[in-house]
């Protein structure tokens, strides 16, 4: 009881009187007639003590205020002048910078420049908090993946790039496009990082919560002394890891030159729209997320794999003139498993084609009869918590064998049929499961788009493939292993809306 009494020295005494309040009249009278063995407790219970936050010592107030969200502290400063003075304590704001934004730097060095932790929180971190996370730039059909993070005492926008074609298993590359930091007490400084001449003056405008734009105020820093030819050669080495002479395919050369001309005209003056990572569910086939995939002459692109009940969808985060960013590149029917033939028969393209086209005919007949799932019309998630993938009657007798092989961990032998091209020959030779799916193909400029049948091949938790039947082409996808902060959708509905928005921009 003595411990409780000491605690109540900084608060109302009612907490120590609970025992007395719970007694009946007889117990109270008996207790009053007994001598209390704790004089300190007797003094506290004898008279009601009143105490407020204003009476607490400054050290305790600092601890209390430092544990509150930074957004609540301005209201406390308006209570009284004492609170306002205490809230100038840098310890409070150092803790808020660390707990809310992960700033673990030694902030004491800021004292040299006259910038306080309070300035860092209010004028840098809190002011630009809405641009943290993942974004897709509006660069025509090409798109992109921007990750804005707090990095020490900077906020940096990193553009994530796929590895050089065709090394889909290599880690992602990234380069800074802009940074924000606090040089003086007045305001934060925005710098453009584009080009090869170092940081220079830039500007950021937050259009709305899920959209912002960047502008370079010194685009001459993007130019090189050797003119456009030197700029193109440098861009080609960074983008493709090779020279134009190394690329013998004429159509591929045209695509590369077209991308350089189109993307370089923006000069880092771009509009970005927020994207979210897909929500996961325990019944998902594999963990959803971002993957790098091979797309023939277009090189490597970034695709977001998400699950929607009995279907999985791959949405392009980066794109090309045929299928632009934001479009749904593949859709997989998780209720239609495909049992591959043995390796010898699998080498025969006609045999695999026969199996896939039989499934497509079943789908067509069911849709016409109204028995099967309705045709896909939009990327909205109608049933985000739908049933897990399982064998269906339409999948044929091989579905049970596929399920057994997946649970046993043995897998199925896999080899590409003769005549099927692949940018990367280093694909796994065993797979866990195969499903019927469709892929989106179109002419240049996204003309005459249509969905064509194919086979989704699941290799493991981090790799899958898609065999484009009509194109006789195989795309290999490998998971992006980077960790992204501030990228989770606030709700499944918000993720659905994001998919609709990025698709509508290029439809």
Swiss-Prot record:
Its main location: cytoplasm. Residues 50-96 form the F-box domain. One of its GO terms (biological process) is positive regulation of neuron migration. InterPro entries: F-box-like_dom_sf, F-box_dom, FBXO31/39. One of its GO terms (cellular component) is centrosome. It comes from the Eukaryota. The modification Phosphoserine is found at residues 33, 264, 448. Residues 374-385 have a biased composition (Basic and acidic residues). Pathway: Protein modification; protein ubiquitination. Substrate-recognition component of the SCF(FBXO31) protein ligase complex, which specifically mediates the ubiquitination of proteins amidated at their C-terminus in response to oxidative stress, leading to their degradation by the proteasome. FBXO31 specifically recognizes and binds C-terminal peptides bearing an amide: C-terminal amidation in response to oxidative stress takes place following protein fragmentation. Belongs to the FBXO31 family. Zinc-binding is required for the structure of the protein and facilitate folding. The destruction box (D box) acts as a recognition signal for CDC20 for degradation by the APC/C complex. This is F-box only protein 31.
